[in-house]
């Protein structure tokens, strides 16, 4: 049996593609999902909390548009996914592309994708 340190070291040496496959295998084996939990917020207290600016944004690929190949290339560049994974993501829109990113990064990603004809939502 491997120690926690050995497991961490093995994960540190994996490629992005290998890590993606590992996550999928863990999801299937244990019946869980690696998606970030969604917090349901209650009503804002006297509107004070609603005025606070959101600091983390999710970038959602809503539609790939007519130039799917260009969109797949940009998705690969942004996410580091392999060709098959990027194609699957683009073919099955709407899908989250990046989660919990800064406003600047979200706007940059949105601009890159819209430049090649994709429809993108920032939430």
UniProtKB/Swiss-Prot annotation:
Pfam families: Ribosomal_L12 (PF00542), Ribosomal_L12_N (PF16320). One of its GO terms (molecular function) is structural constituent of ribosome. Transmembrane segments: none annotated. The keyword Ribosomal protein applies. The keyword Ribonucleoprotein applies. GO terms for biological process: translation. Signal peptide: none annotated. Disulfide bonds: none annotated. One of its GO terms (cellular component) is cytosolic large ribosomal subunit. It comes from the Bacteria. Belongs to the bacterial ribosomal protein bL12 family. Homodimer. Part of the ribosomal stalk of the 50S ribosomal subunit. Forms a multimeric L10(L12)X complex, where L10 forms an elongated spine to which 2 to 4 L12 dimers bind in a sequential fashion. Binds GTP-bound translation factors. Forms part of the ribosomal stalk which helps the ribosome interact with GTP-bound translation factors. Is thus essential for accurate translation. HAMAP family: Ribosomal_bL12 (MF_00368). This is Large ribosomal subunit protein bL12. It comes from Geobacillus thermodenitrificans (strain NG80-2). The lineage of its organism: Bacteria, Bacillati, Bacillota, Bacilli, Bacillales. The gene is rplL.
């Amino acid at each position: 049996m491997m120690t926690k340190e050995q497991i961490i070291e093995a994960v540190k040496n994996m490629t992005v593609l290998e890590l993606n496959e590992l996550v999928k295998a863990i999801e299937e084996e244990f019946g869980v999902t690696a998606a970030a939990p969604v917090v349901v917020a209650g009503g804002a207290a006297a509107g004070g909390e609603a005025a606070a600016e959101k600091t983390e944004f999710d970038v959602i690929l809503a539609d790939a548009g007519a130039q799917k190949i260009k969109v797949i290339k940009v998705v690969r560049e942004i996410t580091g996914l392999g060709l098959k994974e990027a194609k699957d993501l683009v073919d099955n829109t709407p899908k989250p592309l990046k989660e919990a990113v800064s406003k600047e990064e979200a706007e940059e990603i949105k601009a890159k994708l819209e430049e090649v004809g994709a429809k993108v939502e920032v939430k």
